[in-house]
């Protein structure tokens, strides 16, 4: 990537397992993450800002995505979170949720991290369904080099915006099926479906309500993290 010199590129390309308990290693990766975020903001002429609203969240996520046990010691608003469980990042519009997850997607890809994920949006997911009539690309990916499927970790940004109909078909039911499938994938493989949303936990319960409470019950596996602050747009 153009924002790293040759020596730094060698440093990240030699391994995909890093010991972030070493503060020097942590600082290197924190700077790399910021560089990834800045590369995403370059066309807007902006710089990524680390401040009191996101600093602790970024530290947790850097530990988390590198499987560092220190992740479970980080307190965010008095709460700790678990390794291995998917992330649900919520907050107001413009707080920077999608940018953070997009930056991590780029960072994890570049460092060849086994926790790398595809970052997409709810609108992209629904458009895929409207074109193809299914969501297999975001589920098991049957036929992708294996008759048993080849699922991958993903992050769906802006979940909760799917309350619409398409030729009379309820998109909420389609998303519910997706969430069921992603829960099964997580229990079987450990591959996560991370989420960002503008909705509060209370609003999420209303959006994903079903008579048996199955969706909400499965969403209890999530590390729910609230990103506060004014709009950064």
Regions found by a protein language model. Give the residues of each.
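Conserved glycine(s) of the Walker
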Residues: 94-100
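Walker A (P-loop) ATP-phosphate-binding motif of ABC ATPase nucleotide-binding domains
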Residues: 86
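AAA+/P-loop NTPase substrate/partner-engagement loops
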Residues: 107-154
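Hydrophobic anchor at the beta1->P-loop junction of P-loop NTPases
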Residues: 89
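Walker B catalytic acidic pair
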Residues: 157-159
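A short, basic N-terminal segment
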Residues: 1-82, 229-233
């Amino acid at each position: 990537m153009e924002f790293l010199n040759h020596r730094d590129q060698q440093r990240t390309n030699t391994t995909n397992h890093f010991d972030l308990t070493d503060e020097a290693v942590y600082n290197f990766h924190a700077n790399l993450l910021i560089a990834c975020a800045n590369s995403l903001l370059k066309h807007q002429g902006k710089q990524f800002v680390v401040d009191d609203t996101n600093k602790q969240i970024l530290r947790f996520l850097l530990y988390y995505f590198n499987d560092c046990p220190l992740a479970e010691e980080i307190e965010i608003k008095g709460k700790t979170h678990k390794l291995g469980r998917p992330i649900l990042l919520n907050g107001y519009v413009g707080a920077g949720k999608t940018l953070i997850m997009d930056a991590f997607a780029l960072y994890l890809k570049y460092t060849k991290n086994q926790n790398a994920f595809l970052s997409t949006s709810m609108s992209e997911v629904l458009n895929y369904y409207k074109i193809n009539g299914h969501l297999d690309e975001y589920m098991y990916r049957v036929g992708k080099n294996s008759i048993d499927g080849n699922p991958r970790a993903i992050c769906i940004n802006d979940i909760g915006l799917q309350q619409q109909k398409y030729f009379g078909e309820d998109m909420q039911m389609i998303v519910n099926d997706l969430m069921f499938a992603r829960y099964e994938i997580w229990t079987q493989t450990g591959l996560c479906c991370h989420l960002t949303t503008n909705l509060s936990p209370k609003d999420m319960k209303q959006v994903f309500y079903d008579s048996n409470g199955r969706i909400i019950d499965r969403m209890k596996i999530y590390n729910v993290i609230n990103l506060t602050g004014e709009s950064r747009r």
